Every structure is written in structure tokens, then in C-alpha cells.
Amino acid sequence: MRMRNKPWAEDFLLQHDDIVSIDLARKDHIVDWFDQVQPIHIEVGSGMGRFITEMAKAHPEINYIGIERDKNVMIRIVEKAVEQNIRNLRLLTVDAEKLTEIFNEGEIDRIYLNFSDPWPKARHAKRRLTHENFLKVYETILDKDGEIHFKTDNQALFEYSIESMSHYGMKLKNINLNLHDNEPEDNIRTEYEDKFSNKGFRINRLEARF
């Protein structure tokens, strides 16, 4: 999600370095970043932050990390975390391909990919967050029993992701081509999810593991 540039964004984030990190200095210190040692779930591409903040509030027994490379967008998530005093949520402004520089092998229990950029042009396929290059990153940081939960309104990206994950050897389950047709009570909608669902787009979802 692109927002108007805020020249003061980095200074704002630095003032809240107890919950947000804008560099790669957290390697080997992720566990110490939280108040309690608990399973860690991450969302790659947190956008405006509704999903990750609501998940953290609903599941205090889990530590959450929202990953959003756009510092201007990250401001919104920090504001929500501070205003609502969400203690089991931390935030990182890094690119997804650098996750192995942040997390140790097997350190993460679940990865959420919600409404990622579909990068529709074939020449941009390697930028899709379900491309095999990213799957290798996820495989490294996920626990052996860890899972990826993926949601998108983009049918082409969903089909591509199924093919990419299957070709990589991943096991897929709970494939849903119309999530909102019989929406689970525990489904937390992102801002994008509401937007596209209201426009009549079907929401696709799946779970996968290595």
C-alpha cells in the first residue's frame, strides 16, 4: 500500500523502538524482544495493520510480528499498537527476502500472507511472495510443523500460488475459493479484504506446509 511520503516517518518509528525495528539488528534477539516466550507468528506485508493488531489482541498466548517495508504505512500500525497497548506485537520494516537475516532457522511457527501484490506481468513473477525464491526463505525460518496461511482476492495469483507451492513440494489444505460464502467466525478481515469483498470479488484462502 502506497501513502504520501512523511519525511518524519523514520524519526517517529525510532521513538518507538521498543516495538518497531527499522534495521536488521534483531537477529538472535527476537525472543528477548517480547515480554514472554511464546510461539511467533508473522505477517508479511501488514498494510494498515488491522489483521495483525486484531490477531494479537485475540491471541495473547502468541507473539506476533508485522512486517511492512513502507515506513509511511508502518506509522499507522505503531499508532494502533500504542493506543491499544498491544504487548504481544512487534513490527519490522524490512523486505521479505531478508527474513533469513532476521530470524533463525525454525524460529517462526506461522506465516500470514494477506492480499500480497499480485505482480501480474510475467516478467515480475519473481516478486510475487509465493514465488519459489520466497518459499525457500519461508522454509528456512518456519518450524518443521509451521504453516503458511494465504489469502487473496486475485484469482490468477491464487492459481499461480497453488502451482508454485505444489511444485515446491508443499502440502496444501483447506483450499477455499470463496471464503466469505460461509465465513468462519474467527476470520479477521484485512482492510483490503473488506474493500474487494464489497466490490464483489471472491476471497481465496489456503493453508500450506513444507
Swiss-Prot record:
Catalysed reaction(s)?
Answer: guanosine(46) in tRNA + S-adenosyl-L-methionine = N(7)-methylguanosine(46) in tRNA + S-adenosyl-L-homocysteine
Q: Which residues bind substrate?
A: K121, D153, T190, E191, Y192, E193
Alphabetical list of Gene3D superfamilies matching this protein:
Vaccinia Virus protein VP39
Entry's EC annotation: 2.1.1.33
- Report whether tRNA processing shows up as a keyword of the record: yes
Task: Name the UniProt key words of this record, in alphabetical order.
Answer: Methyltransferase, S-adenosyl-L-methionine, Transferase, tRNA processing
The active site annotation covers D117
Q: Which residues form the signal peptide?
A: none
Keyword check for S-adenosyl-L-methionine:
yes
Q: Name one Pfam family in it.
A: Methyltransf_4
Pathway as given in its UniProt record = tRNA modification; N(7)-methylguanine-tRNA biosynthesis
Q: Which residues are recorded as binding S-adenosyl-L-methionine?
A: E43, E68, D95, D117
What GO molecular-function term can you cite, just one?
tRNA (guanine(46)-N7)-methyltransferase activity
Origin: domain of life? Bacteria
What are the annotated GO cellular component locations? tRNA methyltransferase complex
NCBIfam families documented for this protein: PRK00121.2-2, tRNA (guanosine(46)-N7)-methyltransferase TrmB
Report the HAMAP family cross-referenced here: tRNA_methyltr_TrmB
Q: Its family?
A: Belongs to the class I-like SAM-binding methyltransferase superfamily. TrmB family.
Protein name, as recorded:
tRNA (guanine-N(7)-)-methyltransferase
Species of origin reads Macrococcus caseolyticus (strain JCSC5402)
